[in-house]
Amino acid sequence: MADPVRLIVGLGNPGREYEDTRHNAGVWYVDALARRQGVFLTEDKKYFGLTATFSFEGETIRLLVPTTFMNRSGQATAALANFFKIPVTQILVAHDELDLPPGCARFKQGGGHGGHNGLRDIISRHGNSRDFYRLRLGIGHPGSADRVTPHVLSKPSKADRDLIDRAIDEAVHNTADMLRGDLNSAMNRLNGFKA
């Protein structure tokens, strides 16, 4: 068994102009998980984000949506993790993933940042540790590098958003395995899903 997850972070950019953009897929996941748990995210300036907690099998699980911009996501993640003494190996970061098509989602542990500025900052703010879990939410690639920024900062089509939402629903359904530290089960179940 791997370490159980105690902090779940949803990456995105703050503000109404970004809330429906592909780059906020991680936020969509945390919002969906909060709804399923019946909790509400509220602003907590001490942690530079929106936070909530819920109980799972006697353990406190913390949710965080940084209200910093994407490239400063580590500021919020480190502030909360350090205060509650949550090791990096017990953090799950949900983020948009260019290398997966809409409708696909994958759990994994460790790895690089793959050019994702939110992951880059989290790695940097946690002593260059890459050992946190990731939930990679497919948003598709626009085809060329010069189109990546406009792609991630734009809204997906209705069809793509429906696929992303279905993948998020499946990820939420499989989050319990991550909270128990059963990465293999979570990966196997989610990797077998295709919206």
Curated annotation (Swiss-Prot):
Molecular-function GO term, any one: tRNA binding
Location, primary (coarse class): cytoplasm
Gene Ontology process terms (BP): protein quality control for misfolded or incompletely synthesized proteins; rescue of stalled ribosome
Positions bearing the site annotation: Discriminates between blocked and unblocked aminoacyl-tRNA: N13
Amino acids binding tRNA: Y18, F69, N71, N117
Catalysed conversion reaction: an N-acyl-L-alpha-aminoacyl-tRNA + H2O = an N-acyl-L-amino acid + a tRNA + H(+)
Gene3D superfamilies: Peptidyl-tRNA hydrolase (3.40.50.1470)
Pfam families tied to this protein: Pept_tRNA_hydro
Localisation per UniProt entry: Cytoplasm
GO cellular component terms given for this protein: cytoplasm
SUPFAM superfamilies (alphabetical): Peptidyl-tRNA hydrolase-like
Enzyme class label: hydrolase
EC numbers: 3.1.1.29
Active site: H23 (proton acceptor)
Coiled coil, from the record: none
Record bears the keyword rRNA-binding: no
UniProt entry tagged with the keyword Glycoprotein: no
Keywords of this entry: Cytoplasm, Hydrolase, RNA-binding, tRNA-binding
Site-annotated residues for Stabilizes the basic form of H active site to accept a proton: D96
Similarity comment: family membership: Belongs to the PTH family.
Oligomer status and interactors: Monomer.
Function field: Hydrolyzes ribosome-free peptidyl-tRNAs (with 1 or more amino acids incorporated), which drop off the ribosome during protein synthesis, or as a result of ribosome stalling. Catalyzes the release of premature peptidyl moieties from peptidyl-tRNA molecules trapped in stalled 50S ribosomal subunits, and thus maintains levels of free tRNAs and 50S ribosomes.
Record-given protein name: Peptidyl-tRNA hydrolase
Organism: Alcanivorax borkumensis (strain ATCC 700651 / DSM 11573 / NCIMB 13689 / SK2)
